[in-house]
Design a protein with these regions (language model features):
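Acidic, Ser/Thr/Pro-rich intrinsically disordered transcriptional activation regions
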Residues: 1-11
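Hydrophobic/aromatic-rich effector regions of fungal transcription factors
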Residues: 15-25, 38-76, 87-92, 109-116, ...
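Boundary/linker elements of alpha-helical solenoid repeat scaffolds
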Residues: 23-28, 222-224
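Fungal-biased detection of long, low-complexity, Ser/Thr-
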Residues: 39-45, 49-50, 93, 186-321
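Central/C-terminal regulatory/activation regions of fungal transcription factors
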Residues: 75-243
Length: 321
């Protein structure tokens, strides 16, 4: 924040980032405040780069937010230009670890990169070594959740058929085969649906219901080898979004935050409409995770981005039902 008062470019880009974030949350577009600060940030960034042979941390932060804005507004060409420019700036300054702001800048760039990878079904540009990292012990966004004692999971409402279903999702993520070809329609087995033979889970409340819809999306895509953004997953993701909108504000325990992150990144990968709404909603939650949780999140989201991209490459062979 201190840098924003000392650097006009940073001042405008922070106000631009805040205004554009509110636009995404509210489903708005074309706010004059957003565009004013965006124009000023671009103008000042261009002047800074032209006037100096070096690139400052505030210049890099400005380019980062410009990339984030274009990515969150699905402006793919503009986002790619800013991303490539940012990558050149970071490399010219010695890489992410050499950036200032006590590590905050490199942390933000990495997180924004993960979000961009999920939205665009592509490899994360930052935060990996030689592209994708393949941990010795594969980790998914569900790993840390399901490793908790059953007593803790049960106290949060994760039990019975729902818990079995989440384990099924986790196992399928760990054993994902990129050579899987698009197959027939998959339907949740009756034993997984427990007391819900018609697939009606709403009576369990929005949190558990959201987990049911997310699990359906995962297994439908993983077992059939089709993209997360396939047409038949759109009904589930719209219901997932409705559940998230109905979450109680006091549902903010450590476990609940991790599940919320999993749900929102699922929605961002799946939705054809309101894709970026999911990332805008989850951003503050990701920033509130502990260092241990963040480490697990980063490993899990890298694996998820890999699967999202591999399944997207199957789109040409997607089976219509």
């Amino acid at each position: 924040m201190q840098a924003s008062f000392q650097d006009p470019c940073m001042f405008h880009v922070i106000l631009f980032a805040a205004s554009s974030h509110l636009e995404v949350i509210r489903g708005e577009n074309g706010n004059p405040v957003t565009h004013y600060h965006r124009r000023q940030a671009i103008k000042l960034l261009s002047e800074n780069i032209s006037a100096s042979r070096t690139v400052s941390d505030t210049d890099i932060a400005t380019a980062m937010y410009l990339w984030h804005y274009e990515s969150m507004n699905s402006h793919l060409d503009e986002a790619r230009i800013h991303k490539e420019g940012l990558l050149q700036m970071v490399n010219a300054n010695g890489g992410l670890r050499k950036l200032g702001f006590d590590g905050f800048l490199s942390h933000m760039i990495t997180l924004i990169g993960f979000g961009d990878a999920i939205l665009s079904a592509s490899k994360p540009v930052f935060g990996t070594v030689d592209g994708y990292q393949v941990p010795e012990a594969p980790t998914t966004l569900l790993s840390a959740i399901l490793q908790r004692p059953e007593k803790v999971l049960h106290s949060s409402g994760l039990n019975g058929s729902l818990l079995s279903l989440l384990h099924e999702v986790h196992d399928n993520l760990l054993t994902f085969d990129p050579q899987t070809t698009p197959g027939d329609y998959w339907r949740m087995p009756l034993y997984m649906r427990g007391g819900y033979p018609d697939g009606n889970f709403e009576e369990d409340g929005p949190f558990n219901t959201a987990c049911w819809y997310a699990a359906n999306i995962y297994l439908n895509s993983l077992k059939r080898g089709i993209p997360f953004s396939s047409d038949e997953n759109q009904m589930f993701v719209e219901k997932l979004r409705s559940c998230i909108m109905a979450f109680p504000k006091d549902n903010d325990g450590e476990l609940e935050r991790e599940i919320y992150v999993w749900l929102c990144f699922t929605g961002a990968a799946v939705a054809k409409r309101n894709k970026t709404w999911f990332l805008a909603k989850v951003g503050p939650t990701v920033m509130s995770l502990s260092q241990k949780q963040l480490g697990e999140f980063k490993r899990g989201v890298i694996q998820f981005a890999y699967i999202v991209q591999k399944l997207e490459s199957n789109r040409s062979g997607e089976v219509e039902v």
